[in-house]
Amino acid sequence: MLEEPEAATRTAAAVDCKDRPGFPVKRLIQARLPFKRLNLVPKEKVEEDTSPKAAVESKVPDLQLSLGTFESQCHTGSHVGLSTKLVGGQGPIDSFLRATIKPVPSVVIIDLTENCSDIPDSPEGHSELSPDTAGVVTTVEGAAKQQEHSAAELCLLETPSDITCHMEEEPGSPGDPKRTGDCQAGSLQSCPELTPGSRTCPTKELSSWSKAGDLLFIEKVPVVVLEDILATKPSIASLPMMSLDRSVTSESEILESCPEDDSILSHSSTNSSSPTSSPEGPSTPPEHRGGRSSPSTPACRVAKNFVKGSTEKGRSKLHRDREQQREEKEKLREEIRRAKEEARKKKEEEKELKEKERREKREKDEKEKAEKQRLKEEKRKERQEALEAKLEEKRKKEEEKRLREEEKRLREEEKRIKAEKAEITRFFQKPKTPQAPKTLAGSCGKFAPFEIKEHMVLAPRCRAALDQDLCDQLDQLLQQQSVASTFLSDLKSRLPLRSGPTRVCGHDTDIMNRDVVIVESSKVDGVSERKKFGRMKLLQFSENHRPAYWGTWNKKTAIIRPRNPWAQDKDLLDYEVDSDDEWEEEEPGESLSHSEGDEDDDVGEDEDEDDGFFVPHGYLSEDEGVTEECADPENHKVHQKLKAKEWDELLAKGKRFRVLQPVHVGCVWASEAANCTSSDLKLLQQFTACLLDVASPDEPEPGASRREKRDQHILAQLLPLLHGNVNGSKVIIHEFQEQCRRGLLTLPSPTPHLQMPNLEDAVAVPSKARLKRLISENSAYEKRPNFRMCWYVHPEVLKSFGQECLPVPCQWTYITTMPSAPREDSGSASTEGPGQSTPMLLKRKPAATMCITQFMKKRRYDGQVGSGDMDGFQADTEEDEEDDTDCMIIDVPDVGSDVSEAPIPAPTLCK
């Protein structure tokens, strides 16, 4: 805070600040910061001030300007040079300590503690300062006039603020100045004018100034204008000594206002561009403001000690004021912080209360919602349980009903099956043999009577039967016994008696041979005991085509054992012969219903001719030996119905059946041939054995067996027919067998590795299974670029037989009927060989006739092609299944007629 002696206001004597040493003529410009500086004194304190100085200031509002406001109103351009050179090695402080006061330029004093928020509207309002000190006597009226004069010189649009000098005076102490501590609450102050030569902003520089709100800018740079308050030049002649002393005291207080910034002042004084007038002088009258300059006043001498004491006093007072302001500021901050904290706490409490209410409400809603959901879920579960109970009860009822219906259906099915079986087997039922009367054993002492069953024999009471001779011998020995030897020692020296087995050795031959009827009794004395028959055995394999074997097998081997089951007993079995290949499937017989038109012819025939209807003993059909459960139930039902129908037809014809009794004849031994009856000999002579001369067997060649030779011979004859043939395997096999039966096949040119087998093998017709196996192993049914789908023999097979040049398609002359079109080209014209164009005589069966075997398997329609026809050997799978369902009727020429002249019979296939 800057203070001024009170004498300055009373006598209106101005103090010439240029005579004061230590303050160079400098001008500082401080950049305006974007934030507003804090006001150290609250506004309430200024408003509550009731001192007379405040009253005077209230009357003159133009004088109520703080030092910061005054400093901010003094602007200068940045281009003005502010530095001052040293003269004679002396600085501005050296001139301050001189005894003689010399006139110096205006000094810039920066008060950083004041509020610099107020910015003057124009820097030219204070450009002039009158040197005349007599105008200081002018009071508030002069200051008002000065402000009116300065208002006319504004460069900006707004009215400039009043410039005041914070110099106050207390009436009670004329020599003791006192500070107020607040720049905004100052007393009545003089308002000097700036000299014309010390203008801070010339007229030509007004274009660079701009204002935005309360801020002043120079070329977009915010500035704070600081003005020297000690730059006035009062006259020493009109200024009393007391005023000078007070002025010096005021100067010391001014220096104390910024003790911390001494270094800044000294450093910044060299950077000042232009001096600025200070408001420390008296007011000049209006008539001296025309740019006139007054002469300088003589300087006054000031004691050095007096200045030093005043400086220390001002520093202490300034320090106290700052401490007081700091405390007040801290208190104010604490109150504000406390108020904010209370407001924040109150707000948080309200927020917590609202949050708590909201949370309670939400929890309550959630509980109500959960309760409703629980009740709803319970109701849903109850409904679900009730529905499930109803469904379960309904399901149980339906299950019970279904079980009852199933049981009823099974009972009806069993009854029906039993009835059908009884209907079929009632003709084969054996007469019931009368059961032997039960034999009851008599009383056996302690045992109760019991039944003696068929295979039981009552044991005798005494097994050892003693003869009378043995009894007499025992009596003699008892009489002749001596005392020297005891009976016990004699018993020990003898051997015990031995007896035969206690079990019954003999079997009841009558039970075993009850079905055997001996036509004529013959003597069998001297004949050894026959070997007992073993149990019946079933030998059936799934991969074989021949029927299963059902009979006895009494041969025993010493080589094949459980520990070596894969051993080969070549003495007992022939491993080179495959019985499955030798099996010949018989042609299906004619249906029994075909003889309906011949009933009249068969009436007079003997009934014994029907004996051939029965299957020979030991023969089983293909499906025999398999349990009924494995068969198809639908086919089984149809089969049973057809059999019952056929039996009804046979019974309607009047045919009678009787159970055949086996006849047991022989053996007739050579020694007893004379005693044998003629009927037995006549019967046995039909089966007389013929002895044949067997040629010595050829030594087997190493590397090839008889079966392989036979296959090679058949394959050599089959290749011309097979290679390039478009027909199925059934047609090829049938044609080849027919050629073999007629003896039309001849062996091609002999190869070095192939020799002619035995005559029997060459004449025999190969079986269908063997031919099919040879076809599948040595050829493939496929399509090649050179021709369409047909059979192609493997090249290595053709090369081994030397027949690589066989044509495709084959040029075979058929002797059997051919299908109308190939299998893969049903719409194209059939390619027939030379022998296929011969007309055949066909004999059709009646339309109403049906084979009994067609119901055993699923029927395949004519022309149906399987899915595997286009892929190798699977092309004729349907033909294999049709083997058992086809029957063929052939017209056989009369015996004795020439076969070559008679027309070839045409077989008729019936499905």
UniProtKB/Swiss-Prot annotation:
Bias type Low complexity, positions: 265-281
This protein's UniProt keywords: Cell cycle, Chaperone, Chromatin regulator, DNA damage, DNA repair, DNA replication, Nucleus, Phosphoprotein
Record motif PxVxL motif, residues: 217-230
Coiled-coil regions, chain positions: none
Positions of region (Binds to p60): 639-911
Compositional bias segments (type: Basic and acidic residues): 310-408
Region feature (Binds CBX1 and CBX3 chromo shadow domains): 176-327
Residues modified as Phosphoserine: S190, S208, S293, S776
Recorded GO MF terms: chromo shadow domain binding; identical protein binding
Acidic residues compositional bias, start-end: 578-589, 597-612, 876-886
PANTHER family (UniProt xref): CHROMATIN ASSEMBLY FACTOR 1 SUBUNIT A, CHROMATIN ASSEMBLY FACTOR 1 SUBUNIT A CAF-1 SUBUNIT A
Protein name: Chromatin assembly factor 1 subunit A
